[in-house]
Amino acid sequence: AAALVLASEQIITSLFGYGAFGSESVTNTAVALTFFAFGVPAFSILKIFSNFFFARNNTKLPFYLSVVSVIINILISVSLFGKLGFIIIPIATSISSWINVFLYFYFIKKNDLHSFDNKFIYKFTRTLLSVVVMGIILYLLLGFFSDKFNYNESWKFIYLFIIVIISLFSYFLISNFSGAFKFKDIKLK
């Protein structure tokens, strides 16, 4: 999500910024991607939180919470579309998803389905630290490559790929050293 927020314009420019997809289209799409990116952590958390209920054969509560989220999304979108235009759709999606996360969290705590113990908090803070450091590295790399993005149209994708690989590598390295996870814990099948 941090990468999508910081590099949305470079991503959209590199992938779609050619031909009829002009600078205004790139800017509008990049802004929409940025607002959707704020919801990405919520989308991931919702997938995890819903499993607490599915594992206990409780499909009703996730359904009702999803309905509430959709209604909130629609109400925000419809009520503000006239004032803000298309951009309210990704904003409303992210807001309603975060509200849904807090509702899930409330019901998980209320039903005592999970204890957010010290180990969880330790791993979470280390992961957050890794994301922040990766975001700083990404920001610096975007600054370093900014002239190259503007100068050489045909190499934009290559520069973006290099930035993504370095940022991803830094995230995994920092996560490993900070204790968010260990490389030995990763199992590929």
Name every feature range the model reports, one short phrase each:
Residues S115-F116, L140-K189:
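Membrane-proximal transmembrane or re-entrant/amphipathic helices at the cytosolic face
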Residues A1-L6, K83, I87-D112, L128:
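Short alpha-helical transmembrane segments in multi-pass integral membrane proteins
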Residues V5-G39, N150-Y151:
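Interfacial segments at transmembrane-helix termini and the short loops linking adjacent helices
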Residues K60, V67-F102, G143-I165:
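Membrane-interface helix-loop junctions in multi-pass transport and translocation proteins
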Residues F49-N57, F105-K123, S146-Y151, F181:
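Alpha-helical transmembrane segments
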Residues F38-V68, S79, K83:
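Membrane-interface junctions at transmembrane-helix termini in multi-pass inner-membrane proteins
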Residues F35-F38, Y64-I72, I95, I121, ...:
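Hydrophobic residues within alpha-helical transmembrane segments
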Residues L4-T13, S77, F81, I89, ...:
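Juxtamembrane/transmembrane-helix interface segments of polytopic membrane transporters
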